[in-house]
């Protein structure tokens, strides 16, 4: 077992390198779709830490997490662990992006990592450089400017009503300005690139002929209430829903294909609403571990809450489709 491991960014990756001291009792949390990434097994071999599946076993307490492994493409999960100052490894080459991008820094986050990018580091290399702060602290207490007497009439401080109103308005304007700046930043860095990606993906599928192939397969399912219920059960199946949910990409692609078929008259228009519920039956299933972590839920809550939500979506998916079908029958007839 190594004393310190060094993790460098992979090809086209960002951040790092991370130097992690191996401390007994820590755990490796991985929240990834599909099978366990190979780097998790490599980290277990180097550190001797226990690997914990965040989807199935829930997240351990923050003080027990030695490193977090994710597969985020630029959404909220990228910054979830860096915000809590937990070393984060992203197997995707995702940089500083997402709603929590301000917390993603090179000293706590590294992306595009492969097995070859993780190695044992010498203690001398891993030791962080000591910064001489004594002189800085001493110099910080010495002001170079002049001290002015604020007891004079012209310069004395006022805490009257007008001053309080001015300070309150200034604070409100600052908050609104910051919120607007963060909103624009999120739109430019997260929402617009994602919209462009989905649009390009749909265009490729439609132009390549793959869309027609998928549409022919979906038409029998989307052409009747029973077929839509079957589609909802497939999308919300607990073993599939966490992998179908990220970014709602699959739901958007299928929605476009179904919409084209409705426009062509292949699928009756009154089935549009139940079809919408059917293809979104898996909504939020991929976000449950992240949401519970943001809420600082206990480990027992995460362990019980994740499967409960997955099974709950599976149970409620079909009834919502039937309710939508009943409602749409009154709308279009």
From Swiss-Prot:
Species of provenance: Erwinia amylovora
Induction: Activated by sorbitol and repressed by glucose.
Primary location class: membrane
TM spans (from-to): 191-211, 220-240, 243-263, 271-291, 304-324
Active site: 72
Top EC class of this enzyme: transferase
Origin superkingdom: Bacteria
Reactions accelerated catalytically: D-sorbitol(out) + N(pros)-phospho-L-histidyl-[protein] = D-sorbitol 6-phosphate(in) + L-histidyl-[protein]
Location of the PTS EIIB type-5 domain: 1-192
Magnesium keyword on record: no
InterPro entries assigned: PTS_EIIBC_GUT_C, PTS_EIIBC_GUT_N, PTS_sorb_EIIBC
UniProt cross-references to PROSITE patterns, sorted A to Z: PTS_EIIB_TYPE_5
Domain remark text: The EIIB domain is phosphorylated by phospho-EIIA on a cysteinyl or histidyl residue, depending on the transported sugar. Then, it transfers the phosphoryl group to the sugar substrate concomitantly with the sugar uptake processed by the EIIC domain.
Keywords: Cell inner membrane, Cell membrane, Kinase, Membrane, Phosphoprotein, Phosphotransferase system, Sugar transport, Transferase, Transmembrane, Transmembrane helix, Transport, Virulence
Membrane topology qualifier: Multi-pass membrane protein
GO molecular function: kinase activity; protein-N(PI)-phosphohistidine-sugar phosphotransferase activity; protein-phosphocysteine-sugar phosphotransferase activity
Subcellular location: Cell inner membrane
Function: The phosphoenolpyruvate-dependent sugar phosphotransferase system (sugar PTS), a major carbohydrate active transport system, catalyzes the phosphorylation of incoming sugar substrates concomitantly with their translocation across the cell membrane. The enzyme II complex composed of SrlA, SrlB and SrlE is involved in glucitol/sorbitol transport.
Name of this chain's protein: PTS system glucitol/sorbitol-specific EIIB component
């Amino acid at each position: 077992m190594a004393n310190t491991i060094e993790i460098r960014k992979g090809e086209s990756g960002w951040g790092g390198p991370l130097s992690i001291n191996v401390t007994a009792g820590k755990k490796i949390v991985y929240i990834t779709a599909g099978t366990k990434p190979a780097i998790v097994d490599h980290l277990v071999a180097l550190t001797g830490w226990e690997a914990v599946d965040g989807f199935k076993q829930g997240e351990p307490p923050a003080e027990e997490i030695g490193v977090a492994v994710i597969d985020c493409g630029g959404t909220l999960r990228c910054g979830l662990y860096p915000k809590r100052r937990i070393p984060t490894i992203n197997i995707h080459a995702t940089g500083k992006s997402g709603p929590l991008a301000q917390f993603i820094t090179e000293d706590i986050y590294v992306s595009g990592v492969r097995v070859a990018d993780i190695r044992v580091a010498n203690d001398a290399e891993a030791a962080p450089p000591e910064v001489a702060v004594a002189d800085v602290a001493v110099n910080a207490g010495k002001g170079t400017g002049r001290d002015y007497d604020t007891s004079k009439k012209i310069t004395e401080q006022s805490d009257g009503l007008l001053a309080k109103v001015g300070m309150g308005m200034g604070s409100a304007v600052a908050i609104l300005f910051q919120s607007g700046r963060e909103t624009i930043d999120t739109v430019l860095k997260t929402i617009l690139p994602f919209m462009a990606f989905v649009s390009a993906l749909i265009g490729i599928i439609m132009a390549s002929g793959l869309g027609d192939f998928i549409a022919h397969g979906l038409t029998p399912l989307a052409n009747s209430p029973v077929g839509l219920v079957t589609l909802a059960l497939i999308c919300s199946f607990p073993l599939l829903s966490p992998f179908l949910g990220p970014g709602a990409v699959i739901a958007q692609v299928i929605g476009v294909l179904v919409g084209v078929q409705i426009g062509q008259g292949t699928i009756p228009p009154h089935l549009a609403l139940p079809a919408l519920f059917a293809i979104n039956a898996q909504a939020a299933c991929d976000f449950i571990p992240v949401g519970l972590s943001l809420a600082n839920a206990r480990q027992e809550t995460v362990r019980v809450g994740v499967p409960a939500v997955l099974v709950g979506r599976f149970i409620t998916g079909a009834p919502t489709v039937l309710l939508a079908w009943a409602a749409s029958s009154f709308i279009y007839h």
